[in-house]
């Protein structure tokens, strides 16, 4: 990429002659993935260190979209090269241990027919780099996220981040889409994605792809996608992410009483009847949507996808009582304190839950009721039971998020009161202690709790 200085990158991937990705390769026998990241930070600068001339291939928003640091066993990626400030994200599948807990990294490579073992990172060229998959990533996933940020002096500015999907985001969206294409409306999907998983982007990609999903005859699988957010005031971050993926006018309608003179029910009715592709509502407005879908004759025969973000945490409010009355459901009066999970469970029991709606639930802390409502049986051919419990459709564990350094392991700072009291009491009772006893007490303090996060 710089003939005069004989700089060369191991691998560059092109689409129609345009460079879209670079790869620095290392082998674990001599160097690790960390060495490839250091090479990007120190030697793959977006400008020539001597002449200060820009390197087009490595310049943000000008050259390659993503830069991969790859060893035999791990893959990391960055979308902006910025010297020592270059930030890498993992692009790994996750590795299960014997207990079933998913950790950071990749599983061992498969044994091939000739007896040799495949590389743990073989999924990169066997799955990700396949022509259709590779093209779809750049067509449907890559986008520029724009945020207003303020510095320490109080000055506001626009921050741009080029978003490339992490591996679990890419697989989650693809698997849900493939299942929805095969089975149509009326299905449930539970994405058990921990904090640090990038749920906002995953929800946005899912919504846009569901809108574009088509039957073999060209008809839309879902006429509208309803996104339910866990906030009284519509989640600006989620709305912005959804809008930034597709800039077409009229694709998204946000049902917000503060931004329209129309009532929420009227806004919803207009959006659903006009076939607005993506409709964003709050938990409190969600019962209006369910009432319209179930009772409005003009919406009969239409299919809907409902994406629920952390729905089990918030209450639906008094609007749910109107839905309850409209459907003739029992237990009137309790509806205002229900969560969305409980509301849908009530619909299911009343047999009013329509089969023209698919539910896509995203949560990092699924309750038992959430699993029962949105989970799939371990053995799909058998009903849910104690021997065949429900499970999430897709999983990104807290343990993996901790090991990938997206969230902190709070148990590292966990001190049981009893242990702390006993140690403090011993110190009070004996003012002078031997060095050996003190070291033993400190050792106990350092290994307080064996609990693991899964």
Predicted regions and their residues:
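Loop/turn-to-beta-strand initiation segments
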Residues: 224, 275-278, 302-305, 355-360
